[in-house]
A protein has these predicted regions:
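Positively charged n-region of N-terminal signal peptides that target proteins for export
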Residues: 1-4
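N-terminal leader/targeting segments and the immediate start of mature chains
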Residues: 21-58, 64-69, 218-221
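Short hydrophobic/aromatic-rich beta-strand segments that constitute the beta-sheet cores
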Residues: 59, 80, 86-90, 105-107, ...
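Short, surface-exposed coil-to-beta transition loops
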Residues: 73-75, 101, 172-175
Length: 221
């Protein structure tokens, strides 16, 4: 359960920063100076990110599990579709598909058999996390500072780095920190889980598109 939620968090944060809406939200009244600085940093990062309803590309992931000497490596492709969610299509070492939508987290094997599935209707924590992180996909820049202490900086003309430290007790059950870096696209996500596991996801050849291609649309079915 905790590993699934952590996977959901990293996937949704990636989607939030990859396929965001063009609008922005003002910082709420009474926001502290620290939260205001975080909001301004997020706004600056979003201005550097490409604005597109669909982002697709390839990825590699290296996951280190506490107690195991060798990391687990996987690779494949991803699709982020505004209003639909995120799909991770793992191609190596074993084919599988991870779908993250506003209402569901589902892992499916190559033969169509469902490995596991979490639905927001049955898991209140999933609904809460979905609600928060998919709000970010709507460019509500007031959301992240409410749940994370945010540190970071702009790098050169296009680059940026962010570190997210959970303030919310629920998030802290699963996460220690998330580190992201990128330019016009998210390029790397580092996730440190509370139970000691960690993941590094590198995104390769991301491309912005106006609509889902037919093969990608089928991944959301």
């Amino acid at each position: 359960m905790k590993r699934a939620i952590a996977c959901l968090l990293s996937a949704c944060l990636l989607g939030a920063l990859s396929a965001h809406a063009s609008g922005t939200a003002a910082a709420p009244a009474g926001t502290s100076s620290g939260a205001t600085a975080s909001t301004e940093l997020l706004r600056a990062v979003r201005e550097r990110l490409v604005q597109s309803p669909v982002v697709r590309g390839a990825f590699t992931q290296e996951k280190t599990i506490k107690g195991f000497q060798n990391p687990l490596r996987s690779s494949g492709r991803f699709v982020v579709a505004q209003g639909k969610g995120i799909v991770w299509q793992v191609q190596q070492p074993f084919a599988s598909v991870l779908r993250v939508t506003p209402d569901k987290l589902q892992s499916v094997q190559a033969d169509g058999q469902v490995d596991f599935q979490l639905e927001a209707q049955q898991e209140p924590a999933l609904r809460a996390i979905n609600s928060m992180l998919f709000a970010v996909m709507a460019a509500d820049v007031a959301v992240l500072p409410q749940h994370f202490d945010i540190r970071g900086s702009l790098q050169g003309k296009e680059g940026w780095r962010l570190t997210l430290l959970p303030r919310d007790k629920m998030l802290a059950q699963w996460l220690v920190r998330i580190d992201l870096q990128g330019d016009r696209f998210v390029r790397e996500v580092r996730l440190q889980e509370a139970q000691g596991d960690s993941s590094v996801i590198v995104l390769q050849n991301p491309a912005a598109e106006r609509a889902l291609q037919a093969e990608d649309a089928r991944l959301f079915e």
